[in-house]
């Protein structure tokens, strides 16, 4: 999927254009991709190798698509619980921006289950109107400009990682 996302970033201006690309480009595995453009239009593409992509107006995506197909994986990753948590925060609570973003670095959204093959590496915060983004880890934030991107590297200690 990295090549597909790179293509989308280089060729699409809007969420709609990105959705059209994601709907037609084949993928070797199932992926959920949520897209946001400068005008705050968004969509989620549920892509899979064995069926046509489904483009939705969902504002969130976790580790399952429309229905849970792999129950043990869903339990292990808490995909349904994380989706419900996010939807509840968006629809019912209207948290201030920093509180909402901070929730991505705490359970149930943040996981340190690296030894079991599932952990959160980082959280990305995108601000398309400002042409800015941040990568966040517990205790560390790396702010980046999308208008004047400067390549760089960071060494971060990820809690729970080997």
Regions found by a protein language model. Name each.
Residues 1-162:
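C-terminal, well-structured catalytic/ligand-binding subdomain of enzymes
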């Amino acid at each position: 999927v990295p090549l597909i996302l790179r293509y989308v970033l280089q060729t699409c201006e809007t969420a709609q254009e990105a959705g059209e690309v994601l709907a037609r480009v084949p993928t070797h595995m199932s992926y959920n991709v949520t897209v946001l453009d400068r005008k705050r239009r968004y969509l989620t593409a549920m892509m899979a190798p064995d069926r046509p992509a489904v483009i939705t107006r969902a504002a969130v995506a976790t580790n399952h698509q429309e229905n849970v197909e792999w129950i043990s994986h869903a339990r292990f990753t808490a995909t349904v619980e994380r989706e419900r948590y996010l939807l509840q925060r968006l629809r019912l609570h209207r948290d201030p921006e920093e509180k909402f973003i901070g929730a991505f670095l705490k359970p149930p959204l943040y996981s340190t289950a690296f030894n079991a093959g599932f952990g959160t590496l980082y959280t990305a915060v995108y601000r398309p109107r400002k042409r800015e983004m941040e990568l966040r880890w517990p205790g560390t934030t790396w702010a980046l400009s999308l208008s004047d991107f400067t390549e760089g590297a960071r060494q971060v200690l990820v809690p729970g990682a080997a």
